[in-house]
Amino acid sequence: NPKRIAFVEGEDMRVLRATQILVDEGLAKPILIGRPLVIEKRIKRLSLRLKEGTDFEIIDPNKDNRYSSYWHAYHQLTERKGISPEVAKILTRTSPTIIGALTVHLGDADTMICGAIGRYHIHLDHIRQIFGSTPENSNELAALGVLIREDGVLFICDPYVNPNPSLEQICQMTLMAVDQVRRFGVTPKVALVSHSSFGAGMTESACKMRQATAWLHANVPDIEVEGEMHADAALSEVIRQQIFPNSKLQGQANLLIMPCLDSANIAFNMAKSLWNALTVGPILMGCSKPVHIVTPSVTPRGLVNMAALAVVDADSKLV
């Protein structure tokens, strides 16, 4: 049976185009959160062949018989986080992201995609409120950007979630990213990137990446990981061998762990533009449920790619 995907921005034309592709290819059963009349008019404007009830379901924030159970569930989850019953009622009517998250929490959807409209961290805050993280990930979430080119795949972590990750967070996000890279059928080759190469710098950031590398070498010796190093050394074995011939990393790194959100986001968006690469994600890692946040620049095909990944994610999290 196709997995049920709740699309938070159900009225968005990109979401509607993606819904048509998902239905045509039998990849998922979309659930669109939005006003039925608006969705119907836009389907006609786009000349799509979608039929409510047959191809997709609509959750109308203004009129849905699950409203009472949803706001009660939301209040139960957040009553010790400053959310009163009245506020819970209002937010469950007015926040599509909260509604979408509750569909997954209550079993009405298998996975959720949001972020086509609005700021990433607002969506992230709602997801953290309702789901949190898996116990094995020590309450940490992180994002992974994926760049696909003809000559291979490059993963960059963490371009969206953690502004200035601690040593412990760097180690944890590396382990999560390694697991995600393996799900793509790729053997991870990890570089912890810095302005410093192999002990040359003594800034707090360089020391953090150096210590994280040492921890990874000691605790997960089966992972091919090296650091700290410049980005050019990570991507060129020739440069790396000139600087540090005894590197544990062989060949070109395909997973770059960045010291902060600024460096990761800049690198990801610069590489995306310069290489004209196909992007997947960002993939939200560490969440207890298979939910993901895209960005406002996402295309219909990007939403389809994210939906396909979310379906696989939902399958892997089935108990």
Regions found by a protein language model. Name each.
Residues 1-319:
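Anion-binding alpha/beta catalytic cores of soluble intermediary-metabolism enzymes, centered on
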